[in-house]
């Protein structure tokens, strides 16, 4: 039979809690405005991958701990807003414009597509309490971590491009 493309998350109905990760992948029919249903008051993690109709997401005030977004198939920057303190981990793949996230209590893992431009990563993030990993990046542009001052765990940079972290004091 034929199943139409999902265009919104109304199918979640009155779902109130996801104790694990809500994983949304290959939902090509979803488009803006994209929002977490207001009935969903407990959400430990959100993973979004391969959803070309979704280019921005505001997670402020949702209480989501772990955030994972794969935007690697788009050359546009994904606009992600989250609380100033992210209680869990942050995993990003692609180019992003970030708001909030001054402190991430868990790990941060970032993968980037190839680009020749210089990219500011984590433009607001001052502290990563867990491990910080910048992985697979063959870009010829530079990578800036403009305000990152401390990493609580291991700091792993698997990149070819020059990395600047002018305020980094503690690893």
Q: Which stretches of residues belong to each language-model region?
A:
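Concave beta-strand-loop units of leucine-rich repeat
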Residues: 1-31, 35-55, 59-82, 86-100, ...
């Amino acid at each position: 039979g034929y199943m139409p493309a999902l265009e919104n998350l109304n199918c979640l109905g009155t779902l109130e809690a996801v104790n694990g990760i809500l994983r949304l992948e290959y939902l090509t029919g979803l488009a803006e405005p994209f929002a977490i249903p207001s009935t969903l008051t407990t959400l430990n993690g959100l993973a979004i991958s391969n959803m070309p109709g979704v280019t921005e997401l505001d997670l402020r005030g949702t209480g989501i701990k772990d955030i994972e977004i794969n935007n690697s198939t788009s050359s546009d920057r994904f606009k992600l807003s989250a609380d100033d303190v992210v209680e869990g981990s942050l995993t990003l793949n692609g180019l992003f414009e970030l708001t909030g996230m001054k402190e991430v209590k868990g790990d941060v893992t970032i993968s980037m597509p190839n680009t020749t431009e210089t990219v500011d990563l984590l433009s607001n993030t001052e502290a990563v309490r867990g491990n910080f990993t910048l992985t697979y990046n063959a870009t010829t542009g530079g990578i800036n971590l403009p305000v990152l001052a401390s990493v609580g765990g291991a700091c792993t940079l698997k990149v070819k491009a020059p990395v600047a972290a002018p305020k980094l004091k503690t690893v």
